[in-house]
Amino acid sequence: QGGTLVRHYKELAYMGFIPVLLHLRTILHNMKACKRDVLEWNPDVLILVDYPGFNLSVAEFVHAHSPIPVYYYISPKIWAWKEYRIKNIKRDVDELFSILPFEVDFFEGKHHYPIHYVGNPTLDEVEAYKRENEKDFGRFAEDNGLEGKPVLALLAGSRKQEIKDNLPMMVEAASVYEGQYELVLAAAPNIDPEFYGKVLR
């Protein structure tokens, strides 16, 4: 609210080698438009959110071509892969904001780069929901055919491509716990439930 939407993130959200290759022209066009818009609008600060494959390139461009400070919310997961990107982050990002508490030790302890832990909105939402609905779990279990065992939730993502890529392997890996846990697929609100069935057939 209160902003001007130039591109929807769905136009940029491609995962995997083949989808990126097939949409490379669109990705490059959007990248060029984004860089041009930032320089034309000349904001007081540029706030980049997640999506490091795209946003770190934008940060590099803005740092090289303007004095605009670059803030990055949801820090790139360089502790998981491509740790060498810390050099680019140190060079191109003025302030880094994390939603994972352990990242403070990783960035500040290992790489001597200051980072702000700002809490995790998803975790806060889950905790609030649990407090408000603690007494309703029995009804939830009954409505969903759960038998009272601990729940193992499969969170395959919120984009169709990542669900197609991840869900079959997740189900296979989780199946070894079937006797000990209730396996529950947490569906993304923006994905038609039928899509999950098609992926798992």
Enumerate the language-model features and the residues they cover:
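Active-site and donor-binding regions of nucleotide-sugar-utilizing enzymes
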Residues: Q1-A141, L155-E162, Y177, N190-I191
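Short beta-strand segments at enzyme active-site cores
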Residues: L48, L152, V184-A186
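Conserved active-site and cofactor/substrate-binding residues in soluble primary-metabolism enzymes
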Residues: K135, D165-M169, E194
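Charged active-site motifs of nucleotide-sugar-dependent glycosyltransferases
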Residues: L146-A153, Y181-E182
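Conserved catalytic-core segment of nucleotide-activated headgroup transferases in glycan assembly
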Residues: S158-A186
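Nucleotide-activated donor-binding/catalytic signature segment of Leloir-type glycosyltransferases, i.e.
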Residues: G197-R201
